[in-house]
Amino acid sequence: MWINRLVKHPSYSVLRFYTKRLCTVSVKSLREFGVLPNSTICHSVYPRRTYVMGRAVINDILIKKSYSTHTVCAIDRSKDENNGSAYDKFEAKGIPIDVHTLKRIISSSGMDESEFSKSISYLFAKTVDPEPKDVLSLEDLSFLLNKLYTQRFQIRRICRDINAKYSEFWFKLFSLYAEKVDAKRNQVNLRNTKLDACEIFDANLMIKNFIELGQLGKAQKILSFILDRNPDILLSPKNADISTIVHFLQLRCGALAPYWKIPDNSEQKQGFLRKMVRLGAKNTSIRLSSTYKAMDHQTLLKIADLALQEKRLLNSEDLLSTLIQSFGHLGQTQILERCIEHIWQISPQEFPSHVVIKHRGCYPSSKILVSILVSFYFNDHDLHRGLSILDSFIKHYPDVKLDALFWRRLFQLSHFAWTPANDKKATSVVRCWHLMKQWYASKRLRPSVDYETLRQLYDIMKKTGNFPLGIDVLRSFKPGIERMRAENAGKVNNIIIKYQKCIIKELVNRGRFSAVREFIDNYGFDRKMTKDLNIFCANRMFLRSKKMKNKIENKKEREKVRLDSFDDDEDDGMIIGSLW
C-alpha cells in the first residue's frame, strides 16, 4: 500500500512557479474562454495569485449544474478549431456525474486497488473523455477528485442508500491519488522533489473533507503525506502554505473548537460532577484521532512567530482564527492576550473611546471573535473575560459583521455558564438575546435564523418557564423561519412545534385564552399547523377544565370530611361533659 511507502523527501518551494500541468490545463482553458487575459500565463511575478484565481474560477464554474444555450451564445469564442475543442471539453466537464455512475464507483471502493482504478477510469470516460484509458494520468485524477468533492453531499446520500462507507470511499480515492503522485516521480526521476501547488491543494481538500466528517485519523495521515514531502511548508517565510498550516494547527495543536469538551453548569446536579459537552452539532458521531491529543507546542510558537511577522499570513482570517484556538486549547491565554493586542491593539485594559486603533492584520471577523470567545471560556469556565474583550472589539471595530455562527456560540456558552441555583431566570442568557436584537437593529438587519440557536433558547424557555421569551423569539425570527420552512420544513418544524406547544400550554394554564387564540393566529405559519395547534389547544383547555373541576370536587370533599370530623368531636365533647 502507498501508506507504507511514505518517506521523507527533501524538496524545494511549494510556492514556486507552477508546473506545466497547471498552465496547460487550468489557466490555458480559462484564457481560451475569455475568463483570463492572454498575459496571465506568462505573468511570473505573482504565480500563487494566478493559481488561486484560476482554481477559484474553475471551481465556481463546475458547481453550476447546467449551462444554458443562451450562456453559450454569450461567450465570446474564436472560430478557430483549438478554441472550439477547448470549449467542447469545458462543456463536458461542466456536466455533473449521474447517480448510476456514482453508485457504480462507490460500490467498487470495496474492491482491490486495481479494480477501483478501473472504475475510476470508467468514470473519467463517462464524464470527460470518451476515449478509453487503461491508466489515468495524475491530472485526470486530480480533476475527478475536485469534481467529486463538489458532489460530496449527493455521494453521502448514495452511500447511505447502498450501505457503503462514505469515508472509506474518499480514503480509497486518496490512496489511488497518492500512488499516482509517487508513480509520476519515479517515471521522471523526480523522487526527491516536493509536491507542486496543485497536489498540495488536492491533499488539503481531502483533509478538509475528513475534518468535516470527524475522521481525524485519516486527516492526520494525509497531513503527514504533505509534511513528509514538503518539510519547510510550515515555517518557511517564502514557502509556507496557509491551508497546510491551518490543518496542522487543527490536527496537531487542537484548533478544532467544535470538538472541545466544555463543562455544562446548567445540567449540574448537587453532589455530581459537571456534564461535559461538545459545541459541534454532530458531536456524538465524531471519531477523534489517537494523535489528536499529542500537541506540538514548539511548532505552534514558531508558527505564531512567523505569522506575526509575515503580512500575507496576518491577512488570513482562517490562520489567525486557528492560531487563537490553538493557544486557547493549550491554555496559553497570556500569549493569546498579547497576540490580540499586537494584531488588533485590543487588551483587557480598557482604552479610552477616542483612541484611534489600527489593526496590523485582517479586519476582525465573526470567525475570529468566536475563536476568542470560545478560547477564553474553555480556560476560565465563564464568559467574563471573553465578553470584555468582545465588547472592546465591537466598540473599536464598528464594521465587524457578526453572523449566525457567532450568536450560536454565544448562546451555547452563556447557556453552559448558567447556574440555575444562582440565577433561576437565566438573566445572563436573556441579556445575550437582547444584545443580539440590539445589534441587528443598529445594523438595520433582520436576525438570521439558526437551528441550534432556536434549540438553546427553547431549553432556556422550558427550564425557566419564560414563555414571553419564546414569543419574542418567534416574533423576531418569523421571516427567517418561513424561509427555512420553504427550504427544509422537516427539521425546523420539530423545534417550532415545541415552541408553540410549550407557549400554548403555559398560556392555557394561566387562563389567558384570548392570548392563546392570538398566538395561534400569528404563529401558525400554515393551515395544517394552525389546525393541529387548535386541536392541541382544545385538548389542553379540556384537561385544564377537568383538572379544575377535580380540584373543586376534591376541595368540597375535604371540606365535608373536615365538617364531619368536627361534628364527631363535638358529640364526643358533649358525652364526656355529661359524664363529668
UniProtKB/Swiss-Prot annotation:
One of its GO terms (molecular function) is RNA binding. One of its GO terms (cellular component) is mitochondrion. GO terms for biological process: regulation of translation. Residues 1-40 form a transit peptide. It is found in: Mitochondrion. InterPro entries: ATPase_expression_mit. Keywords: Mitochondrion, RNA-binding, Transit peptide, Translation regulation. Its main location: mitochondrion. Required for translation of the mitochondrial OLI1 transcript coding for the mitochondrial ATP synthase subunit 9. Belongs to the AEP2 family. Binds to the 5'UTR of the OLI1 mRNA. This is ATPase expression protein 2, mitochondrial.
